[in-house]
């Protein structure tokens, strides 16, 4: 195995917290933390070994960079330190991202240097022009989507001609860019923040292909700027494989996919069940889900609803329960109001996928108190060299054991 050199930004940028050269050690540390966390409700010896990230380096399919500016006017485009006072880190290398992403970062820096009148956005005061630069990478072709987010406030609005300069710099490069999107962030006091999206080059999506490792079941997905998609494509397929094995489908099940995002889990698992119902609150994501259902010819197997999980569960609390509920919520977890109505639905099996095991543990305690039993726990790494760990748990109703 080749020697891996540590990144020069290690411990500074707020990304990696452990040396890139010591991946095995960081994996053991994550596993130990998970064992200690779940020991009160599940025997650590029965937790399955952590599935390592593959690839360990340059596997991230999405990365967001922040524009930053000091009071003295010093600019940076990269990451922002997690400690106070906040500082911008103008990264010149990153072992987590593809080299093409770094090229886009450098092209955008050069464009910003040519426009000193553009200031970095400062969220606390809603001031400044340039917010973030996001790069998404498709798989397996590694085509690129680039998203520039700027302020929509009139006094900080970026002229279309200046945006055109940025777009042309990207197009004139040799990079495989298939989508360029300009977003305007609309933010005001006592009003929800939203984004006006402008497609300025190519398609409004990138393609992601997922293939389950064991049986080769494959799906193609159109992912839009604000659609959720697992940050490591190969690991995302493994998560779905684990969910399938935990579900042990017989072909007659109804599956409820809460927080369905772009529909990836439901679409991939629809090959093994009778019916899938997907629920998602983000309009961009549900549009992607509907599109992906058609692309994969699953319209007779899957229904999706633009609705928050709590409202959906409340509306269906008196209906026959689904056989399996798959939950892949944001970092904040299911939350009490959703949990309350989920327990009224009372499905036989719950497969809980989480990127925040601490919240997952707390909510599993509530599920256990309500009559569920943890059957299996499978951790998986998606964020090498960081403290974050994905965890997949199978819970079954005690009366169905």
From Swiss-Prot:
The keyword Metal-binding applies. GO terms for molecular function: 4 iron, 4 sulfur cluster binding; metal ion binding; rRNA (uridine-C5-)-methyltransferase activity. GO terms for biological process: rRNA base methylation. The keyword Iron-sulfur applies. Belongs to the class I-like SAM-binding methyltransferase superfamily. RNA M5U methyltransferase family. S-adenosyl-L-methionine binds at residues 230, 259, 280, 328. Signal peptide: none annotated. [4Fe-4S] cluster binds at residues 7, 13, 16, 94. This is Uncharacterized RNA methyltransferase CCA_00883. It comes from the Bacteria. Its EC number is 2.1.1.-. The active site is at 355 (nucleophile).
């Amino acid at each position: 195995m080749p020697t891996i050199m540590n990144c020069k930004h290690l411990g500074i940028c707020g990304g990696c917290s452990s040396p890139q050269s010591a991946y095995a050690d960081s994996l053991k540390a994550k596993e130990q933390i998970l064992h200690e966390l779940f020991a009160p409700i599940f025997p650590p010896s029965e937790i399955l070994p952590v599935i390592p990230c593959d690839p360990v380096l340059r596997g991230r399919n999405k990365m967001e960079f922040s524009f930053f500016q000091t009071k003295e006017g010093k600019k940076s485009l990269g990451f922002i330190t997690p400690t106070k006072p906040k500082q911008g880190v103008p990264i010149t290398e990153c072992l987590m991202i593809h080299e093409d992403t770094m090229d886009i970062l450098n092209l955008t820096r050069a464009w910003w240097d040519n426009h000193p009148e553009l200031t970095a956005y400062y969220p606390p005061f809603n001031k400044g022009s340039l917010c973030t630069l996001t790069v998404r990478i498709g798989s397996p072709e590694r085509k690129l989507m680039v998203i520039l987010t700027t302020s929509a406030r009139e006094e900080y609005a970026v002229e279309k001609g200046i945006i055109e300069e940025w777009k042309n710099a990207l197009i004139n490069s040799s990079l495989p860019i298939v989508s360029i999107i300009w977003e305007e962030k609309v933010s005001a006091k006592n009003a929800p923040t939203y984004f006006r999206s402008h497609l300025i080059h190519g398609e409004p999506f990138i393609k992601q292909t997922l293939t389950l490792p064991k049986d080769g079941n494959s799906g193609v997905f159109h992912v839009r700027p604000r659609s959720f998609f697992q940050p490591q494509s190969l690991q995302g397929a493994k998560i779905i494989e684990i969910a399938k094995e935990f579900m042990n489908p017989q072909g007659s099940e109804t599956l409820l996919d809460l927080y369905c995002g772009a529909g990836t889990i439901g679409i991939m698992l629809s090959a093994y069940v009778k019916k899938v119902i997907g629920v998602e609150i983000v309009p961009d994501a549900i549009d992607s889900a509907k599109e992906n259902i058609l692309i994969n010819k699953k319209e007779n197997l899957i229904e999706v609803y633009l609705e928050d999980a709590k409202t959906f569960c409340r509306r269906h609390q008196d209906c026959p329960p689904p056989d399996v509920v798959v939950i892949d919520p944001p970092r904040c977890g299911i939350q009490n109001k959703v949990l309350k109505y989920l327990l009224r639905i009372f499905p036989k099996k719950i497969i809980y996928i989480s990127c925040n095991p601490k919240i997952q543990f707390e909510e599993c305690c509530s599920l256990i108190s309500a009559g569920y039993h943890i059957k299996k726990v499978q951790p998986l790494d998606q964020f090498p060299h960081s403290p974050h760990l994905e965890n997949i748990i199978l819970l079954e109703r005690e009366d169905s054991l």
